[in-house]
Amino acid sequence: MAITDWPEGERPREKLRAAGAMALSDAELLAIFLRTGVAGKSAVDLARELLKRFSSLNGIFAASAEEICQVHGMGLSKFVQLQAIFEMSRRALLEQMQGRDVLTSPQAVRQYLSLRIGALPREVFIGIFLDAQHRVLAVEELFSGTLTQTSVYPREVVKCALRHNAAAMIFAHNHPSGVPEPSQADRALTEALKAALNLIDIRVLDHFVVAGNQLVSFSERGLI
């Protein structure tokens, strides 16, 4: 049944106007952006299928164009729409961090990192470059690797930090395995980065390991 044939109070757009966006399920919100379904499948049905296949909204946003287009009813146009939504969300969260001390807004940092790298199928390592007041200067993806290993070169990180005139840094990388527990290699890397950056008086404030919506902070664990 097409959404236009549903009772008015159950249609996602009308429901949002009446009760606000918080009242909608993930599938209903997604359906608003998808706009249309296909024969025999409403936009809500299509949204539910995407959520089932990719497990979460983050999983959908991290999926490639090829993976999205394998779902009947999805095409490049809808993939582009989803990527635009994702990028707007990332930029909105980045705006929340900019212009303020990130140490006083840890939730914004966590949300941003989870959205940016939490669902990626490959391991990536990013740096958040901060000024002396711990305000965000830039966020960069520094390195990427396979599902099990990332090659990170402290010398290259130092070059980036100097280019941004950073006074402090926060690092983050994801574990595609879904387990955010820091490994011995993660700890060794953090120590190497701390030592290299200490030579140019740049502090490492934290290193987050991200897996989906789960994050582990080195600082909170007393590992930094």
Swiss-Prot record:
Motif annotated as JAMM motif, chain positions: 173-186
Q: Which UniProt keywords apply?
A: Hydrolase, Metal-binding, Metalloprotease, Protease, Zinc
The MPN domain, residue ranges: 102-224
Q: Which InterPro entries match?
A: MPN, RadC_JAB, RuvA_2-like, UPF0758, UPF0758_CS, UPF0758_N
PROSITE patterns per record: MPN, UPF0758
Listed under GO biological process in this entry are:
proteolysis
Chain positions recorded as Zn(2+) binding sites: 173, 175, 186
Entry GO MF terms: metal ion binding; metallopeptidase activity
Note the NCBIfam families from the entry. Answer: PRK00024.1 (NF000642), radc (TIGR00608)
Q: Which family does it belong to?
A: Belongs to the UPF0758 family.
Q: What is this protein called?
A: UPF0758 protein Mfla_0315
Source organism per UniProt? Methylobacillus flagellatus (strain ATCC 51484 / DSM 6875 / VKM B-1610 / KT)
